[in-house]
Amino acid sequence: KNIFQIKINKSIEILVVHNPGEKNFHQDNVGIILEENKILEILSKRYTDVVITEINKREDLDELLKRKPDLVFSGVKYFNFNKKKIWLNDCLELYDIPYIASNRAALDNESDKDRAKKLILKAKIKTADFFVTNPGEHHSETSIPISFPLFVKPVRGGDSRGVDSNSVVYNFASFKKKVLEIKHKFNLSSLVETYLSGKEYSVGILQDSTNGTLRAMPVEIIIKKNKNGHCILDFDVKKDDEEKVIAVTDAK
Protein backbone atom coordinates (compact mmCIF):
# COMPACT_ATOMS: atom_id res chain seq x y z
CA LYS A 1 0.00 0.00 0.00
CA ASN A 2 1.27 3.46 -0.89
CA ILE A 3 1.03 5.72 2.18
CA PHE A 4 2.00 8.79 0.14
CA GLN A 5 -1.06 10.53 -1.33
CA ILE A 6 0.90 13.04 -3.42
CA LYS A 7 4.11 12.15 -5.23
CA ILE A 8 7.05 14.52 -5.43
CA ASN A 9 7.83 15.67 -8.96
CA LYS A 10 11.46 14.52 -9.15
CA SER A 11 13.41 12.38 -11.62
CA ILE A 12 15.60 9.62 -10.20
CA GLU A 13 17.73 7.23 -12.24
CA ILE A 14 18.85 3.97 -10.66
CA LEU A 15 22.10 3.33 -12.48
CA VAL A 16 23.45 -0.20 -13.01
CA VAL A 17 26.07 -1.91 -15.15
CA HIS A 18 25.99 -5.31 -16.81
CA ASN A 19 27.02 -8.13 -14.50
CA PRO A 20 28.81 -10.87 -16.49
CA GLY A 21 28.59 -13.43 -13.69
CA GLU A 22 26.07 -14.82 -11.25
CA LYS A 23 24.00 -12.73 -8.85
CA ASN A 24 26.29 -10.70 -6.57
CA PHE A 25 29.31 -11.55 -8.75
CA HIS A 26 32.18 -9.30 -7.63
CA GLN A 27 33.06 -6.43 -9.96
CA ASP A 28 35.98 -4.16 -9.07
CA ASN A 29 34.16 -1.09 -10.35
CA VAL A 30 31.03 -1.70 -8.26
CA GLY A 31 31.11 -0.72 -4.60
CA ILE A 32 27.49 -1.48 -3.70
CA ILE A 33 25.44 -4.24 -5.32
CA LEU A 34 21.89 -2.93 -5.70
CA GLU A 35 18.59 -4.77 -5.90
CA GLU A 36 17.44 -2.26 -8.48
CA ASN A 37 13.90 -3.56 -8.94
CA LYS A 38 13.15 -3.33 -5.21
CA ILE A 39 14.63 0.16 -5.10
CA LEU A 40 12.51 1.13 -8.11
CA GLU A 41 9.38 -0.13 -6.36
CA ILE A 42 10.15 1.79 -3.16
CA LEU A 43 11.15 5.09 -4.76
CA SER A 44 8.24 5.02 -7.21
CA LYS A 45 5.84 5.26 -4.27
CA ARG A 46 7.19 8.70 -3.43
CA TYR A 47 8.55 10.18 -6.67
CA THR A 48 6.94 10.68 -10.07
CA ASP A 49 9.77 9.68 -12.42
CA VAL A 50 11.96 6.75 -11.37
CA VAL A 51 13.72 4.54 -13.91
CA ILE A 52 16.50 1.95 -14.10
CA THR A 53 19.33 2.92 -16.45
CA GLU A 54 22.02 0.49 -17.58
CA ILE A 55 25.31 2.07 -18.63
CA ASN A 56 27.31 -0.03 -21.10
CA LYS A 57 29.23 2.58 -23.11
CA ARG A 58 30.38 6.18 -22.91
CA GLU A 59 27.43 7.34 -24.99
CA ASP A 60 25.03 5.96 -22.37
CA LEU A 61 26.74 8.05 -19.71
CA ASP A 62 26.69 11.15 -21.92
CA GLU A 63 22.94 10.77 -22.43
CA LEU A 64 22.45 10.51 -18.65
CA LEU A 65 24.41 13.73 -18.14
CA LYS A 66 22.25 15.49 -20.75
CA ARG A 67 19.05 14.36 -19.01
CA LYS A 68 20.41 15.73 -15.71
CA PRO A 69 18.13 13.82 -13.32
CA ASP A 70 17.42 15.17 -9.84
CA LEU A 71 19.27 12.19 -8.33
CA VAL A 72 21.41 9.28 -9.48
CA PHE A 73 21.06 6.23 -7.24
CA SER A 74 23.95 3.84 -7.88
CA GLY A 75 26.62 1.65 -6.34
CA VAL A 76 28.95 1.98 -9.35
CA LYS A 77 32.37 3.47 -8.57
CA TYR A 78 33.82 3.94 -12.04
CA PHE A 79 33.65 2.96 -15.72
CA ASN A 80 36.39 1.84 -18.09
CA PHE A 81 35.69 3.42 -21.47
CA ASN A 82 38.37 3.22 -24.18
CA LYS A 83 40.99 2.27 -21.58
CA LYS A 84 40.14 5.40 -19.58
CA LYS A 85 38.74 5.23 -16.05
CA ILE A 86 35.83 7.60 -15.38
CA TRP A 87 34.74 7.93 -11.75
CA LEU A 88 30.95 8.17 -11.74
CA ASN A 89 30.29 10.48 -8.81
CA ASP A 90 33.16 12.83 -9.65
CA CYS A 91 31.66 13.09 -13.13
CA LEU A 92 28.20 13.78 -11.70
CA GLU A 93 29.64 16.52 -9.48
CA LEU A 94 31.01 18.30 -12.55
CA TYR A 95 27.45 18.44 -13.91
CA ASP A 96 25.86 19.37 -10.55
CA ILE A 97 23.87 16.13 -10.43
CA PRO A 98 23.17 14.86 -6.88
CA TYR A 99 24.09 11.24 -6.11
CA ILE A 100 24.28 8.71 -3.30
CA ALA A 101 27.50 7.11 -2.03
CA SER A 102 30.91 8.81 -2.25
CA ASN A 103 33.32 10.46 -4.66
CA ARG A 104 36.74 9.05 -5.54
CA ALA A 105 38.63 10.72 -2.69
CA ALA A 106 36.24 9.35 -0.07
CA LEU A 107 36.24 5.89 -1.67
CA ASP A 108 40.05 5.82 -1.59
CA ASN A 109 39.99 6.64 2.12
CA GLU A 110 37.39 3.95 2.72
CA SER A 111 39.17 1.27 0.70
CA ASP A 112 42.50 1.78 2.48
CA LYS A 113 41.54 0.63 5.98
CA ASP A 114 44.82 1.76 7.55
CA ARG A 115 44.27 5.28 6.22
CA ALA A 116 40.60 5.18 7.27
CA LYS A 117 41.51 4.21 10.84
CA LYS A 118 44.07 7.02 11.07
CA LEU A 119 41.53 9.55 9.80
CA ILE A 120 39.07 8.33 12.43
CA LEU A 121 41.69 8.81 15.16
CA LYS A 122 42.56 12.26 13.83
CA ALA A 123 38.89 13.19 14.13
CA LYS A 124 39.03 12.06 17.80
CA ILE A 125 36.55 9.23 17.22
CA LYS A 126 37.05 6.02 19.18
CA THR A 127 38.10 2.96 17.18
CA ALA A 128 39.55 -0.44 18.03
CA ASP A 129 43.33 -0.61 18.56
CA PHE A 130 45.08 -1.81 15.40
CA PHE A 131 48.28 -2.38 13.48
CA VAL A 132 49.26 -3.45 9.96
CA THR A 133 51.44 -6.48 9.38
CA ASN A 134 52.82 -8.98 6.86
CA PRO A 135 53.93 -12.62 7.19
CA GLY A 136 57.12 -12.99 9.22
CA GLU A 137 57.02 -9.57 10.88
CA HIS A 138 56.04 -10.98 14.27
CA HIS A 139 58.05 -13.93 15.58
CA SER A 140 56.27 -14.45 18.89
CA GLU A 141 53.05 -13.60 20.68
CA THR A 142 54.86 -11.09 22.88
CA SER A 143 55.85 -9.05 19.82
CA ILE A 144 52.20 -8.35 18.95
CA PRO A 145 51.30 -4.85 20.21
CA ILE A 146 47.68 -5.60 21.20
CA SER A 147 46.06 -8.47 23.08
CA PHE A 148 44.07 -11.43 21.78
CA PRO A 149 41.40 -11.99 20.57
CA LEU A 150 42.15 -10.18 17.32
CA PHE A 151 40.29 -9.54 14.08
CA VAL A 152 42.37 -9.96 10.90
CA LYS A 153 41.38 -8.74 7.42
CA PRO A 154 43.01 -7.40 4.24
CA VAL A 155 44.17 -3.80 4.59
CA ARG A 156 42.51 -2.83 1.29
CA GLY A 157 39.34 -3.75 -0.56
CA GLY A 158 35.61 -3.98 0.02
CA ASP A 159 32.70 -6.44 0.11
CA SER A 160 34.34 -8.09 3.17
CA ARG A 161 36.67 -9.96 0.81
CA GLY A 162 39.13 -11.97 2.90
CA VAL A 163 36.84 -11.95 5.93
CA ASP A 164 35.58 -15.37 7.03
CA SER A 165 35.09 -17.56 10.11
CA ASN A 166 38.87 -17.63 10.64
CA SER A 167 39.19 -13.84 10.87
CA VAL A 168 38.76 -13.90 14.65
CA VAL A 169 41.97 -15.32 16.12
CA TYR A 170 42.65 -16.30 19.72
CA ASN A 171 46.27 -17.41 19.53
CA PHE A 172 49.56 -16.78 17.73
CA ALA A 173 49.28 -19.82 15.45
CA SER A 174 45.86 -18.72 14.12
CA PHE A 175 47.17 -15.16 13.73
CA LYS A 176 50.11 -16.28 11.58
CA LYS A 177 47.90 -18.56 9.50
CA LYS A 178 45.36 -15.85 8.67
CA VAL A 179 48.01 -13.20 7.87
CA LEU A 180 49.74 -15.66 5.53
CA GLU A 181 46.43 -16.59 3.85
CA ILE A 182 45.64 -12.94 3.12
CA LYS A 183 49.08 -12.42 1.62
CA HIS A 184 48.80 -15.52 -0.60
CA LYS A 185 45.19 -14.97 -1.74
CA PHE A 186 45.16 -11.18 -2.15
CA ASN A 187 48.85 -10.14 -2.08
CA LEU A 188 47.95 -7.63 0.64
CA SER A 189 49.08 -6.71 4.12
CA SER A 190 46.71 -7.45 6.99
CA LEU A 191 44.92 -4.96 9.20
CA VAL A 192 44.79 -6.44 12.70
CA GLU A 193 42.37 -5.00 15.26
CA THR A 194 41.24 -5.74 18.77
CA TYR A 195 38.19 -7.96 18.31
CA LEU A 196 35.03 -6.18 19.43
CA SER A 197 32.14 -8.54 20.07
CA GLY A 198 28.59 -7.25 20.04
CA LYS A 199 26.16 -5.79 17.56
CA GLU A 200 26.94 -4.73 13.99
CA TYR A 201 25.81 -1.34 12.72
CA SER A 202 26.04 0.63 9.49
CA VAL A 203 25.35 4.36 9.31
CA GLY A 204 24.47 6.22 6.14
CA ILE A 205 25.10 9.98 6.23
CA LEU A 206 23.11 12.11 3.80
CA GLN A 207 23.83 15.77 3.10
CA ASP A 208 21.06 18.21 2.20
CA SER A 209 22.31 19.95 -0.93
CA THR A 210 20.24 23.05 -0.18
CA ASN A 211 21.72 23.92 3.21
CA GLY A 212 24.57 21.46 3.81
CA THR A 213 23.05 19.84 6.89
CA LEU A 214 23.91 16.21 7.58
CA ARG A 215 21.52 13.46 8.59
CA ALA A 216 22.62 10.13 10.05
CA MET A 217 20.55 7.05 9.20
CA PRO A 218 21.78 4.09 11.30
CA VAL A 219 20.73 0.48 10.83
CA GLU A 220 21.54 -2.65 12.81
CA ILE A 221 22.73 -5.63 10.78
CA ILE A 222 21.53 -9.00 12.10
CA ILE A 223 23.78 -11.96 11.28
CA LYS A 224 23.50 -15.61 12.31
CA LYS A 225 26.34 -17.12 14.31
CA ASN A 226 28.95 -18.94 12.21
CA LYS A 227 30.52 -22.31 13.01
CA ASN A 228 32.75 -20.67 15.63
CA GLY A 229 29.88 -18.92 17.35
CA HIS A 230 30.65 -15.43 16.01
CA CYS A 231 28.27 -13.05 14.26
CA ILE A 232 30.49 -11.72 11.45
CA LEU A 233 29.43 -9.87 8.32
CA ASP A 234 31.83 -11.83 6.12
CA PHE A 235 32.17 -12.19 2.36
CA ASP A 236 29.84 -15.19 2.01
CA VAL A 237 27.13 -13.61 4.18
CA LYS A 238 27.14 -10.53 1.93
CA LYS A 239 27.34 -12.55 -1.29
CA ASP A 240 24.40 -14.76 -0.32
CA ASP A 241 22.30 -11.93 1.21
CA GLU A 242 22.04 -13.77 4.52
CA GLU A 243 22.01 -10.66 6.72
CA LYS A 244 18.91 -8.80 7.88
CA VAL A 245 18.73 -5.05 8.45
CA ILE A 246 16.55 -3.15 10.91
CA ALA A 247 16.30 0.61 11.42
CA VAL A 248 17.70 2.06 14.63
CA THR A 249 14.94 4.19 16.14
CA ASP A 250 16.39 4.77 19.62
CA ALA A 251 17.20 8.50 19.78
CA LYS A 252 20.16 7.78 22.09
Report the location of each language-model feature.
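Active-site nucleotide/adenylate-binding loops and adjacent lid/helix of ATP-dependent enzymes
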Residues: 4-19, 65-66, 108-191, 197-198, ...
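A short, local hydrophobic-aromatic micro-motif
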Residues: 100, 128-129, 217, 233
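Short small-residue beta-strand/loop micro-motif enriched in glycine and branched aliphatics
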Residues: 100-102, 159-162, 244-247
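Short glycine/serine/proline-enriched coil/turn segments at secondary-structure junctions
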Residues: 81, 158-160, 226
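ATP-binding N-terminal substructure of ATP-dependent carboxylate-amine bond-forming enzymes
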Residues: 1-99, 105, 111, 115, ...
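Phosphate-binding site of ATP-dependent enzymes
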Residues: 171-252
